[in-house]
């Protein structure tokens, strides 16, 4: 094949399957194996109704994705027409696309926790008070409504073909599946420093004030380290999973749509000048400060920790306090 033909081949989009379709059997097998592990070592890690809800979330998300896939593809191809360059299907382009797509996911994921409109869709993934591989299946039914796909459009505008972007996005999703487990504690420090791991992602699913809105990474934890959103798992503080205001129900439709219902109620009842705030400000925001956001919860916790620390120091320095013996 001549040089011109090779160059043309690199520019022609290949037929790429959805890698997630091929990973589903492995997902099922790993969930089964984790269930066996939990039955022997930690029976409380799985709750039948919770697991069934997670499976229903996954099924519904698949159906919703199939319904909206055509519209997302059409918009992606339309944006691709106005690309700044044409990036070939070369080995280096695949690596660049994978890394940049993971950064786009970080931006999306961080936004999904900081803007209530996007949180209304993403909250589905955090609604379980258990943390196991079935939790990974809790994907949104309303991602298209929330416009989450917009965060990948800049890659196509830059010149990556939509087929490449969707394929590496599938790989990203596959990677994130296995980190939803408590069966694995920690990896070697070099791996924990670069990659997202079960330990890092457990932090992300926590409701503890120390951990709220941290570790947004998909594959590479370096984004959190770079942008100040990384927090390590602390062994002496057990993680509490779920959302700040727990649902207290396994009702599937309520689990899927409860935050959208909450937005509608708040927008309807809010003063005119504050209506948009209930869609675009952080979850928990109110115009009168009557509810907590993750920031106010963390600030109150930090103040409490500082007070405990100062009280402890004052007690140790007080006259008559027992001083520790020198080594």
Feature annotation, model-predicted:
Residues 130-134, 181-327:
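Cytosolic/stromal cytosol-facing helical appendages immediately following the last transmembrane segment
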Residues 1-18:
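Short, strongly hydrophobic alpha-helical membrane anchors
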Residues 59-68, 87-240:
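Membrane-embedded catalytic scaffold of the fatty acid hydroxylase/desaturase
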Residues 18, 22, 45-62, 93-94:
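Loop-to-helix transition at the N-terminal end of transmembrane alpha-helices
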Residues 76-86:
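Membrane-interface helix termini and inter-helical loops of multi-pass transporters
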Residues 26-38, 72-73, 98-104:
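Central hydrophobic cores of alpha-helical transmembrane segments in multi-pass inner-membrane proteins
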Residues 32-52:
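Membrane-interface helix-loop junction between the first two transmembrane segments
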Residues 34, 55, 223:
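Residue-level signal for inorganic ion chemistry
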């Amino acid at each position: 094949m001549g040089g011109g033909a090779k160059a043309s081949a690199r520019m022609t989009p290949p037929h790429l399957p959805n890698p997630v379709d091929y990973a589903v059997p492995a997902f099922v097998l790993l969930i089964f194996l984790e269930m066996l592990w939990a039955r022997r070592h930690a029976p409380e890690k799985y709750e039948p109704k919770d697991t069934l809800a997670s499976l229903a979330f996954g099924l519904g998300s698949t159906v919703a994705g199939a319904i909206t896939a055509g519209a997302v593809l059409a918009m992606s191809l339309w944006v691709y027409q106005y690309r700044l360059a044409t990036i070939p299907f070369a080995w280096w382009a695949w690596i660049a696309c994978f890394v940049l797509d993971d950064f786009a996911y970080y931006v999306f994921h961080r936004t999904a926790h900081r803007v209530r409109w996007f949180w209304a869709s993403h909250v589905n993934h955090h609604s379980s008070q258990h943390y196991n591989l079935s939790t990974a299946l809790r994907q949104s039914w309303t991602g298209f409504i929330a416009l989450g796909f917009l965060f990948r459009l800049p890659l196509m505008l830059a010149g990556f073909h939509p087929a490449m972007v969707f394929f590496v996005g599938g790989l990203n999703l596959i990677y994130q599946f296995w980190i939803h487990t408590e069966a694995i504690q920690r990896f070697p420090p070099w791996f924990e420093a670069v990659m997202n791991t079960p330990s890092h992602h457990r932090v992300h699913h926590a409701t503890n004030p120390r951990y709220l809105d941290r570790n947004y990474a998909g594959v590479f934890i370096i984004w959190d380290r770079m942008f100040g959103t990384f927090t390590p798992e602390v062994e002496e503080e057990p993680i509490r999973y779920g959302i700040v205001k727990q649902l207290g129900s396994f009702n599937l439709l309520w689990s899927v749509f409860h935050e959208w219902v909450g937005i509608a109620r708040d927008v309807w009842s809010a003063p005119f000048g504050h209506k948009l705030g209930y869609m675009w400000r952080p979850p928990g925001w109110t115009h009168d400060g009557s509810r907590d956001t993750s920031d106010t919860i963390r600030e109150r916790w930090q103040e409490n920790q500082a007070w405990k620390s100062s009280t402890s120091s004052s007690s140790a320095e007080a006259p008559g306090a027992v001083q520790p013996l020198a080594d």
